[in-house]
Structures are given as C-alpha cells and as structure tokens.
C-alpha cells in the first residue's frame, strides 16, 4: 500500500494525517505548541517550536501506523496563513519570533500607509486585499524596522522571509528550497495576483528587499524532497502546498465557478470559486487566489464571520444555558421556531459585509413567553444568517449564482444548524464524510502531482457525501425571517462610541 501524508500546521497545533488512495484516514498525530502574548493585541509563535512539533508528528504518524517511510509517496503541506517568519539564510536561525496572523501590532503602520494617496486602492486592485495588520506585508516591515541589524542584513541579501509553508519546506529540504505556492503568496499583501509576480511598487513603499522573498510555484507539483532519516534516508517529494482555507476549498472539490465552502469554526470562513475571473468586491470581501495549477490560477472571493461557533461557547461558558455545545441541537428542536427572537453575536463588531468595529451583541424581539430554548435556537440561527450575509455579497460582487454550499468544521456536525442553513439560503447544503477537508486538500494536491490520483475528475468522484440538506422553508417565510435578521443587525450597529 502507498500513502500520502498531509502536514496541517495550524494556529494552535501541528498535525500530520495519513491518507490512503480511497481517502480513508489511516492515522492522525497532533501536538499543541505555545502561544506567546508579549503585549496586548500581540501574538507570536516560536518558529523552532513550529518546526519541532510538525516534524515530531510526522515521525509519530508513520511509526504509529506501523508503515515504512518507503510507503509514503508524497507529502502535502497546508498552513495557517499570513503568519510571518524571517530567518538568516546561512544559519537558518529566525531573527525574531513568528508574527501570527491575529497579531495587531502593525495597525499603526497600516494607518500610515492608508494616508498615502491612492495606496489602499492600488493594494485592493492588485493584491485583492485590504491594507490591514492581518496580512504579512506590514509584519515583515515591522521586523526589519524593529529588530536590531535586520534591515542591514536584509539589504545585504542575508535574510529570508516565508509564510509557514515556506519555513517548513526550507526545514524539510535542509535549507535547499526557498519557495511558496500561489495561495500563500496571495496572502502577503505583496503579491500581484493579476500579473502573478511580486509587486515592485508595494515592496518599494514598504521598503522590503525583493531578495528576501520566496519563489512562487504551482500549488501542486514537486517543491523539493524531504529527507526523512538523515543522509541516505528516504527522499519524499513535497508535492502539494496551499493555505488552510484554500486547501479546504480544494478538499471539498470546489473546482468550478460558483462552488463554495463554509468552514464553521470559532468564526466562519467562506470561499467561493470565481474561476479565472479576478472579481473586485464592493462589499468588503477580499479577492484571493483559490489555487494555482499548471501555471494558471483560479480566483476566489473570501469573507469571514468573526463569531460562529464562539457564540455557542458563550451560551455554555457565560450564560450557562448548556453544559455541552452538542446539546444546542436538542434544545433548539424543543420549540417550533425562535418566536421572533434574534441573537446578533457582534461581540467584537461585525465582519463581512458590514465591517462595523463598533457594533455590539444583542438579543432582540424578546416577549414574556421567550425562554432559553428560543435563545439557544436563535443563537444557532445567527450562524446561518451571517453565512447568508456573506454569500449574498459574493453573488452580488461576482454576478455568479451560488451553486450549493459544501460545509466542514466543528459546527457542521449540528444537523439543526445545517437544516436551517439550507432553508435560509434556499440552496442545498452538502456535508462530506471526511470533515478533515483542509488536510485532504493538501493530500489531493500532492497526490495529483505524483500520479496517486489521476486528475480532478477522479477526486470529484472520490469525494463522498455524508448528508445533503435541502431547503423545505417556503420563500415567503424565508424572506420574512431574513428581513427580521437585517433589522436586528441594524439595531446593533455603531453601538460603541
């Protein structure tokens, strides 16, 4: 038997997942690592700990499955996106901790960049992104400006930059390969996703030497070889690389224009494949590269909901209405509807398509008969409403009709939520049997490159449906409920002065 290993380097843990040809999961190994918070709003990881945890679980998953390294035909990598590492090209030592995507330390740099006439528009038109602390560009600038000697060393060509995928490729190949894929490059705010090259104008504005940047390659193809077991060990091709959300889109076999996926985690991440069209959003969504294959790219629109599953944690930990998040389905089904109650979980403001940082959460429409079941049900419904908000914006921006929604992530296991999602969208919602779609995407990309799977058609056929939820709600009722949601959202806006 031959296998593929997907390395899934996430924000809180590193995982390795072993797949066979039929996409069965043969083994999983996982190790959490340290979150570092040096100041308020700052988040860092130790790059050496990212590497040791990731290489550790790789060895562990092979040993536990009782197979030989020679049975592994390829490695795929998927990773937390935007997180930024700068290291010395000769010693391989990081000059600073990894600055994580969540870190807000460069917000001030972003404010200054926004003052430059036309710069924000230029970034949006060419990288598809917003000028924001979330993306890698300003994080690199911060390291060069604040770490002693970093700028001089970078200008001499001694330092390299990479997102987490690039760092892992560098370490796996013993410093031979400095490369990334199209999807990860598209999250740096430095990559021109129309011309498919590093953008000189942005590099100049941020004062980042081009010599630091990795080579950008197809998401599926040989990046280099991982030497497991040192000299004379088995060399395994690193053959697939994609950022986590794009990898999940691929793992859901969303290969056609209009196909979309939602990952229901703490927040929700929605991506819609827009094919070969670069679609500029007028609704606060970002445009990104969905995947790069054979020197060509497909684009996607991306929108995120800040509070998805986190609202269920709030019911459990703060309101103490439930003891386990799985109980929400039982309570939601005890009432026939939410009795006009709406929960708007704008705890940290509202994300796409509203972008109101000053909105705050609210429970609206309460009457004397409203009870805990209505509030629990309305909280689950809020996740579906917010998903609809983003998908509606995607349809408006792209002019592409939504072609069903594929779902994954923790809350996708909640049947009540999935039924309501289908009802409120008026579209089918498809849940796969393999919910590890992020890792599966990386495995697919690697497998295609080495001929483990022949082509995308074979993958599409192997994608197995667990359950399809179809809409049963009359249009009139759907429109009325959604209008109530929009009214509730209006009430929460600009609450904080």
Curated annotation (Swiss-Prot):
Keywords attached to this Swiss-Prot or TrEMBL record, sorted alphabetically, are: ATP-binding, Glycerol metabolism, Kinase, Nucleotide-binding, Transferase
Reactions mediated catalytically: glycerol + ATP = sn-glycerol 3-phosphate + ADP + H(+)
**PANTHER family cross-referenced by the UniProt entry:** GLYCEROL KINASE, SUGAR KINASE
The molecular function terms of the Gene Ontology recorded here are: ATP binding; glycerol kinase activity
Which residues take part in binding glycerol? 81-82, 134, 244-245
Annotated family: Belongs to the FGGY kinase family.
Physiological role: Key enzyme in the regulation of glycerol uptake and metabolism. Catalyzes the phosphorylation of glycerol to yield sn-glycerol 3-phosphate.
Q: What is the lineage of its organism?
A: Bacteria, Fusobacteriati, Fusobacteriota, Fusobacteriia, Fusobacteriales
Gene, per the UniProt record: glpK
Q: What is this protein called?
A: Glycerol kinase
PROSITE patterns noted in UniProt: FGGY_KINASES_1 (PS00933), FGGY_KINASES_2 (PS00445)
Species annotation: Fusobacterium nucleatum subsp. nucleatum (strain ATCC 25586 / DSM 15643 / BCRC 10681 / CIP 101130 / JCM 8532 / KCTC 2640 / LMG 13131 / VPI 4355)
Q: What Pfam families does the record tag this protein with?
A: FGGY_C, FGGY_N
- Annotated residues that bind ADP are located at 11, 15, 266, 309, 410, 414
What is the top-level taxon of the source organism? Bacteria
Q: How does its record describe regulation of its activity?
A: Inhibited by fructose 1,6-bisphosphate (FBP).
In this entry, which stretches build a coiled coil?
none
Q: What is its EC number?
A: 2.7.1.30
């Amino acid at each position: 038997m031959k296998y593929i290993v997907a390395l899934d380097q996430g924000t809180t843990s590193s995982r390795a997942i072993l797949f066979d040809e039929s996409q069965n999961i043969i083994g999983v190994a996982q190790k959490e690592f340290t979150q570092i918070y040096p100041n308020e709003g700052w988040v860092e990881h130790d790059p050496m700990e990212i590497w040791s945890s990731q290489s550790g679980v790789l060895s562990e998953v092979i040993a536990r499955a009782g197979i030989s390294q020679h049975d592994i035909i390829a490695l795929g990598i998927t990773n937390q996106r935007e997180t930024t590492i700068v290291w010395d090209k000769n010693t391989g030592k990081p000059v600073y901790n990894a600055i994580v995507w969540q870190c807000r330390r460069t917000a001030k740099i972003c404010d200054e960049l926004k003052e430059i006439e036309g710069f924000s528009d230029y970034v949006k038109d060419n990288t598809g992104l917003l000028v924001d602390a979330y993306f890698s560009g300003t994080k690199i600038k911060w390291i060069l400006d604040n770490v002693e000697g970093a700028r001089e060393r970078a200008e001499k060509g001694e330092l390299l930059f990479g997102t987490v995928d690039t760092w892992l490729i560098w370490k796996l190949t013993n410093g031979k390969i400095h490369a990334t894929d199209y999807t990860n490059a598209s999250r740096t705010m430095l990559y021109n996703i129309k011309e498919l090259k590093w953008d000189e104008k942005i590099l100049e504005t941020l004062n980042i030497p081009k010599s630091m940047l990795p080579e950008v390659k197809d998401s599926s193809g040989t990046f280099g070889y991982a030497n497991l077991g040192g000299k004379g060990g088995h060399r395994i091709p690193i053959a697939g690389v994609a950022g986590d959300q794009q990898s999940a889109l691929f793992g859901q076999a969303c290969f056609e224009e209009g196909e979309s996926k939602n990952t229901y985690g703490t927040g929700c991440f929605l991506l819609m494949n827009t094919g070969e069209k670069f679609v500029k959003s007028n609704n606060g969504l970002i445009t990104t590269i969905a995947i790069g294959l054979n020197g060509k790219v497909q684009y996607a629109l991306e929108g995120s909901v800040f509070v998805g599953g986190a609202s269920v944690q709030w019911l459990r930990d703060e309101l103490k209405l439930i003891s386990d998040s799985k109980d929400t389905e039982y309570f939601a089904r005890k009432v026939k509807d939410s009795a006009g109650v709406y929960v708007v979980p704008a705890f940290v403001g509202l994300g796409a398509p509203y972008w109101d940082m000053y909105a705050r959460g609210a429970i609206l429409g309460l009457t004397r008969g409203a009870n805990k079941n209505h509030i629990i049900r309305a909280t689950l419904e809020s996740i579906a409403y917010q998903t609809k908000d983003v998908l509606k914006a995607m349809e408006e921006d792209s002019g592409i009709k939504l072609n069903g929604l594929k779902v994954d992530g923790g809350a996708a296991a909640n049947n009540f939520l999935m039924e309501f999602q289908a009802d409120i969208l008026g579209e089918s919602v498809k849940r796969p049997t393999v919910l590890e779609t992020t890792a599966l995407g990386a495995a697919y990309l690697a497998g295609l490159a080495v001929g483990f799977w022949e082509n995308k058609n074979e993958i599409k056929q192997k994608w197995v449906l667990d359950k399809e939820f179809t809409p049963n709600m009359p249009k009139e009722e759907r429109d009325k409920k959604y209008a109530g949601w929009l009214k509730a959202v209006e009430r929460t806006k600009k609450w904080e002065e």
